[in-house]
A protein has these predicted regions:
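Active-site phosphate-binding and catalytic loops of NTP-dependent enzymes
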Residues: 23-28, 174, 197-202, 222-226, ...
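Helical mechanochemical/support elements of P-loop NTPase systems and associated helical scaffolds
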Residues: 11, 127-138, 154-162, 184-188, ...
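Beta-sheet entry/capping signal
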Residues: 1-4, 43-45, 143-146, 173-177, ...
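Extended, highly charged linker/hinge segments and catalytic-adjacent loops that couple domains
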Residues: 199-202, 206, 213-220, 225, ...
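Long, highly charged, low-complexity internal segments
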Residues: 41-47, 51-124, 233-358, 400, ...
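Intrinsically disordered, low-complexity regulatory segments
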Residues: 1-216, 497-498, 511-514
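Short glycine-centered, acidic/aromatic-flanked micro-motifs in structured strand/loop junctions
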Residues: 149-151, 341-343, 370
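Generic, well-ordered alpha-helical scaffold segments in large soluble proteins
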Residues: 18, 138-141, 161-165, 191, ...
Length: 515
C-alpha cells in the first residue's frame, strides 16, 4: 500500500480524485478521513493533516550536573542536552522558585527564569493526537510513503514532522516527495511521476523559524508582562512579526499626531474653447477646467489677490501647448504581496483575498497562492495556460490575438525562486462557475497573467498653459493612444482626460474662477 500524506483534507480528496482510475472510496481511520483508490493495480491511500501536527515547546525544567553540565528534562523525565552560557549561575541554588537544588523550573512566569529559558532545549509535542494516531496506523501497513504537503518551507516542515511520526512505526518504507503548484490533472500526474527526495534543509529552515518564534514570543511576552504588571493583570504579548509591525504602526501614529494641518487655498478656472470670450454655457466637449499654476496658495491674501486679478475677465490666451508620449510597461507576474495589494485596491481585504485564493487553488482554478516568485519558470507552458482560459468569452478574442502574434514572452519581476511559479490561472472559469467574490479575484489573476504576456501601453499627455489677466492656469490631459496590456488589464487605469484642440496664441472663453 502506498501512503500519500497531504497538508489538508481537501488536498487528500483532490489528489485521490485526480490520480485514481475510478472514484476514490472515502473511509475513516480513528475518525480521520482517508481516501482509498487503485493506481495500476496498487492500493493507494491519501490522508490529510490539519497543518502542523506537532508543536514546539520548551522542556519544563533544567537540571545541572557537574560532570554532564546542563540538560533539559521533559515531562516524561527524558534528558535533552542543553548549552547554556558560562555566565549564568549554576547550582547549588537555594530552593526558592523558580530555582530547585539542582536546576531551574521553567513553567512558571518568573523573571529569574527568563535568562535560562532562552537556552532551554525545545521538544516537539503532539498537537493533533487523533490524526497522529491515524497516520501511524496507516504507516504501519505502508510499503512506501509519499509526502505531498505544500512545497514551501512550512509545507516541508509539516511533511517532515509527519514523516517522523511514520518512522516511529515503520523504519523501512521508502519515502519520496511530490512537488506541485496546482491541482490540475497534468500537474499532479507529473508530480507523482517525478517524485524527489525530501528537502531536509528546507524543513530545517522552517523549524528554525518556528523555534525563533517560540523563543522570541515566550521569553519577551513573559518579560514584558512581568515588567508591566509584576506578574498580575493582562498579558503583554510579543512576537517576531507582531512586535515590529506594532512598531511601524506606532511610528506612523506618532507622525499623524505630530502633524500640524495648514490652511491652503485652491483656485480653479472654467474655460470654453468653443468661443474666444465668455461668458458661455460652459457645457459640451469644448468646455474644460484648469487649476491655477500655483496649486496651493499658503497665504489667503495671495489667493484673494489672484482672484481679484481675474475678476471680470472673459477671455484667456493659450500661452503654450506641450504634448509628450510616454510608455507604460506591462506589469510583472503576481506574487502573494502584489496580489493582495491589487485585490485591496478592488475592495478585497488581504485576509479575504488569501481565503479566496486558497479556495481557488484547491478547486484547481489558480496555482499555489503563497509565493515570493515573480518570474515564470521555463517549464511553464505559457501558450497552454492561454489556451486553458481562452474559453472564457471575456478573454477569448484577446487570447487568440496573443497566440497569433508569435512566441509568447512574459515580463519578469525582481524575485526569482525555484519552489513555486508566480500566481497564474490554471483553468477556465466564468461568472457562472464561481461566486461573485471568487470570480472577482479569479478575473484579476487571469487578466494579470494575460497582461504579463502583452506589450506596453502608450499614453499621450498634454499640458496647456493659459493666461488670464496675468494669472497662469495649467490644464493637463491624458489619452490612451496604444492600449497594449491595458486592453485586457484595466485596473488602476484613469479615465481619459481629453482636452479640446488648442493652439498657441489662441483665445478661449473664460467663465470665471472659484476658490
Amino acid at each position: 500500500m502506498k501512503l500519500v500524506v497531504t497538508e489538508k483534507n481537501d488536498a487528500a480528496v483532490k489528489i485521490a480524485d485526480l490520480l485514481g482510475a475510478e472514484k476514490p472510496t472515502a473511509d475513516k481511520v480513528f475518525n480521520t478521513p482517508v481516501y482509498r483508490f487503485d493506481v495500476d493495480g496498487e492500493e493507494w491511500v491519501t490522508i490529510g493533516l490539519r497543518g502542523h501536527i506537532l508543536e514546539p515547546d520548551f522542556t519544563p525544567s533544567l537540571i545541572y550536573k557537574k560532570r554532564g553540565g546542563w540538560s533539559g528534562v521533559t515531562a516524561e523525565g527524558e534528558a535533552l542536552p542543553a548549552e547554556l552560557p558560562a555566565s549564568l549561575p549554576t547550582p547549588p541554588f537555594k530552593k526558592k522558585k523558580p530555582f530547585t537544588a539542582d536546576g531551574v523550573e521553567l513553567k512558571g512566569w518568573k523573571m529569574e527564569a527568563l535568562p535560562y529559558l532562552i537556552y532551554a532545549p525545545i521538544e516537539k509535542l503532539p498537537k493533533e493526537k487523533d490524526i497522529i494516531r491515524s497516520l501511524k496506523n496507516l504507516a504501519k501497513k505502508a510499503d512506501s510513503i509519499v509526502i505531498a504537503t505544500d512545497f514551501d518551507r512550512e509545507g516541508e516542515l509539516i511533511g517532515s514532522d509527519a514523516l517522523s511520526c511514520c518512522r516511529e512505526v515503520n523504519t523501512t518504507a521508502p519515502v519520496s516527495r511530490a512537488r506541485y503548484s496546482a491541482f490540475t490533472k497534468p500537474e499532479i500526474t507529473h508530480a507523482f511521476a517525478n517524485l524527489v527526495p525530501m528537502d531536509d534543509d528546507l524543513a530545517a529552515a522552517g523549524g528554525s523559524r518556528r523555534d525563533i518564534d517560540l523563543i522570541w514570543g515566550a521569553v519577551l511576552t513573559r518579560y514584558l508582562t512581568l515588567v508591566k504588571f509584576a506578574g498580575y493583570g493582562n498579558v503583554r504579548s510579543s512576537g517576531r512579526v507582531q512586535t515590529p509591525t506594532l512598531a511601524i504602526i506606532v511610528e506612523r501614529e506618532r507622525e499623524r499626531m505630530a502633524f500640524v494641518p495648514e490652511d491652503y487655498w485652491v483656485i480653479r478656472g472654467a474655460f470654453d474653447a468653443g468661443a474666444a470670450a465668455g461668458p458661455t454655457p460652459g457645457e459640451g466637449p469644448e468646455a474644460f477646467e484648469a487649476p491655477h499654476a500655483t496649486a496651493r496658495f499658503k497665504v489667503e491674501a495671495e489667493a484673494n489677490a489672484a482672484m481679484d486679478h481675474v475678476a471680470g475677465a472673459t477671455s484667456a490666451r493659450v500661452v503654450s501647448v506641450e504634448k509628450k508620449k510616454r510608455t507604460v510597461a506591462p506589469p510583472v507576474p503576481f506574487n502573494t504581496t502584489s496580489l493582495m495589494a491589487a485585490a485591496s485596491a478592488e475592495g478585497i481585504s488581504p485576509a479575504r483575498c488569501m481565503r479566496i485564493a486558497e479556495s481557488l487553488y484547491m478547486d484547481g482554478y489558480i496555482s499555489y497562492p503563497r509565493v515570493d516568485n515573480t518570474v515564470y519558470p521555463d517549464s511553464l507552458d505559457l501558450a497552454e495556460v492561454v489556451n486553458a482560459i481562452a474559453g472564457n468569452p471575456a478573454y477569448g478574442p484577446y487570447c487568440r490575438e496573443l497566440l497569433s502574434a508569435g512566441p509568447l514572452k512574459a515580463t519578469r519581476g525582481k524575485t526569482e525562486t525555484t519552489d513555486h511559479p508566480p500566481i497564474y490561472p490554471t483553468a477556465k472559469a466564468t461568472p457562472d462557475d464561481l461566486s461573485a467574490a471568487d470570480y472577482k479575484l479569479y478575473n484579476l489573476i487571469a487578466r494579470r497573467f494575460l497582461a504579463t504576456l502583452s506589450g506596453p501601453a502608450t499614453v499621450e499627455g498634454t499640458k496647456v498653459t493659459l493666461d488670464v489677466a496675468g494669472e497662469p492656469f495649467v490644464a493637463k490631459g491624458d489619452v490612451l493612444v496604444e492600449p497594449g496590456f491595458r486592453a485586457i488589464y484595466p485596473y488602476g487605469l484613469k479615465k481619459d482626460e481629453t482636452l479640446p484642440a488648442l493652439g498657441e496664441g489662441a483665445s478661449v472663453a473664460f467663465n470665471g474662477a472659484t476658490c
